[in-house]
Amino acid sequence: MINLRKTHPLLKIINHSFIDLPAPSNISAWWNFGSLLGICLMIQILTGLFLAMHYTSDTMTAFSSVAHICRDVNHGWLIRNLHANGASMFFMCLFLHVGRGIYYGSYLYKETWNIGVILLLTVMATAFVGYVLPWGQMSFWGATVITNLLSAIPYIGQTLVEWVWGGFSVDNATLTRFFALHFILPFIITALAIVHLLFLHETGSNNPSGINPDSDKIPFHPYYTIKDALGLMFLLLVLLLLALFSPDLLGDPDNFSPANPLNTPPHIKPEWYFLFAYAILRSIPNKLGGVLALLASILILLIIPLLHTANQRSMMFRPISQTLFWILTANLITLTWIGGQPVEQPFIIIGQLASMLYFLLILVLMPLAGLLENYMLKPEW
């Protein structure tokens, strides 16, 4: 009998992507995050769909509809908590996935990497518009502050802001369009993720050593399906612990108050996963400069392949680069902490130093470390 999964037009694609795919024999748990991100996306789309069935995108009823979901809809509280904390898990996996790419030199697959950066930006946009939907205080003021950044664009800035708002302030038109965007973007993310995978399968996966693994490949199933399943168990464990025991741990208490344009919260800040970028934005005492630094903090990922100076792909055997990588990680954690603090000393100067170090590490120190390691590997050294 002819094996259906190898001949059927649709099953053949699935087979080549997830079953008979040749994979390096030595990829570690750091390679789990791609599949975990796929699972996160599916969880978010499903929980989001059920939330959308009960949510109303109107300024008068949005806040009440979220309360109604949590109080009156069967398991509505669970669906909402899974969706809100699922976003945090999504970003946790995203940051680890990008970090893995930087550490092991996966960015040298340029198409895969660039699509990945576009994916990151799209997920960030989705999370931002989604945070506005409950129409709490932080939703409203977060939307006001972040959309206002567009006004820093010379000449067309103010027109652009009013175009995004659909009026002269964040109001009903803004909420309605943000809901529409929040509904459509995850499907665009799904399409981009498929393209991401398509480009990855053109080259095959990288591996911790950074050496071409073609001479030693194993089938994806059962070896990596079982490994991914273990990662999934951990993901679900953490997500359920968060959603069931401390669902509001990562949220802002201000969002329990309905949006009020006449009352500004004392500290306007985004969700934890945007705090590092928010800290960089605030560290420059100029509107346009801050916006450019904010954009640069993410878009810098696009030029990382151009800054690769080392003869070795991975950092596995490069201790100087490793040290700088972990300094960068600590620096990002510091920026995340600063982003959640009020704008006063000593937080201002710490934020400015951390922002400077962030760009210095990526643009100068890490490429120099690569060159130094090349020199140290020469036999005459």
Curated annotation (Swiss-Prot):
Keywords: Electron transport, Heme, Iron, Membrane, Metal-binding, Mitochondrion, Mitochondrion inner membrane, Respiratory chain, Transmembrane, Transmembrane helix, Transport, Ubiquinone. Heme b b562 binds at residues 83, 182. It is a multi-pass membrane protein. One of its GO terms (molecular function) is ubiquinol-cytochrome-c reductase activity. A ubiquinone binds at residue 201. It is found in: Mitochondrion inner membrane. Pfam families: Cytochrom_B_C (PF00032), Cytochrome_B (PF00033). GO terms for biological process: mitochondrial electron transport, ubiquinol to cytochrome c. Gene3D superfamilies: Cytochrome Bc1 Complex, Chain C (1.20.810.10). Its cofactor is heme b. Disulfide bonds: none annotated. The chain crosses the membrane at residues 33-53, 77-98, 113-133, 178-198, 226-246, 288-308, 320-340, 347-367. Belongs to the cytochrome b family. Heme 1 (or BL or b562) is low-potential and absorbs at about 562 nm, and heme 2 (or BH or b566) is high-potential and absorbs at about 566 nm. This is Cytochrome b. The gene is MT-CYB.
